[in-house]
């Protein structure tokens, strides 16, 4: 194993009174615990990859950490679960640095037109970007030197621009649309 992408996630954008403990446990289990468990399970193989010079990476699909209360108030449980993934990035990047394993987070600037989007009432897919933007950003990021590029919280379009891709219009569900819906956790 040279690359681990922790993308699995459970979502419930509900306030505290409307979040059953079963839903809370699901989000924490899939998002935070799942990221930790998968990373732990792959660690020996990732260390072997590093020893063989194969540039190992862990990429968590999780947001930049921000303690601004407006990200917590509407959906404390979901924010805690997603930030649990981001805290894995923060801790594992430092822990795994001596072994030459990169650990980074990647997050979309805008809403992405995926099946998960259908769980959010009232979101128009025409205001979103396609999943390909995240795939392309991940591809570029995972090619970077693991020893030099770790512990970062990156945004998809910034990664692409850093790699010379300036025209992002093709990633929009509706090309030419400049009114894209910002994703959660983007300040």
For the regions a language model picked out, list residue spans one by one.
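Conserved catalytic-site loops of classical short-chain dehydrogenases/reductases
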Residues: 2-3, 25, 53-61, 101-104
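Conserved NAD(P)H cofactor-binding loop of Rossmann-fold oxidoreductase domains
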Residues: 7-13
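Short beta-loop-alpha junction of Rossmann-like oxidoreductase domains
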Residues: 14, 69-70, 101, 105-120
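Substrate-binding pocket helix/loop in short-chain dehydrogenase/reductase
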Residues: 15-16, 20-25
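A short, exposed helix-loop element centered on a Lys and neighboring polar residues
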Residues: 39-40, 90
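Catalytic loop of short-chain dehydrogenase/reductase
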Residues: 47-98, 110
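C-terminal helical subdomain
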Residues: 98, 105-106, 122-187
């Amino acid at each position: 194993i040279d690359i681990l992408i922790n993308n699995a996630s459970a979502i419930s954008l509900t306030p505290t009174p409307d979040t059953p403990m079963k839903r809370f446990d699901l989000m924490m289990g899939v998002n935070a615990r799942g990221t930790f468990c998968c990373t732990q399970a792959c660690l020996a193989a990732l260390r072997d990859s590093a020893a063989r010079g194969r540039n190992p990476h862990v990429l968590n699909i999780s947001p930049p950490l921000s303690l601004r209360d407006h990200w917590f108030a509407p959906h404390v449980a979901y924010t805690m679960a997603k930030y649990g993934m981001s805290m894995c990035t923060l801790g594992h990047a430092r822990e795994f640095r001596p072994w030459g394993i990169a650990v980074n987070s990647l997050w979309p600037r805008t809403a992405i037109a995926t099946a998960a989007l259908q769980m959010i009432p009232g979101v128009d897919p025409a205001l979103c970007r396609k999943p390909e933007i995240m795939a392309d950003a991940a591809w570029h990021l995972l090619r970077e030197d693991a020893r030099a590029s770790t512990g970062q919280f990156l945004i998809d379009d910034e990664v692409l621009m850093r790699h010379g891709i300036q025209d992002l219009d093709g990633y929009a569900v509706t090309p030419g649309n400049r009114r894209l819906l910002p994703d959660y956790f983007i300040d």
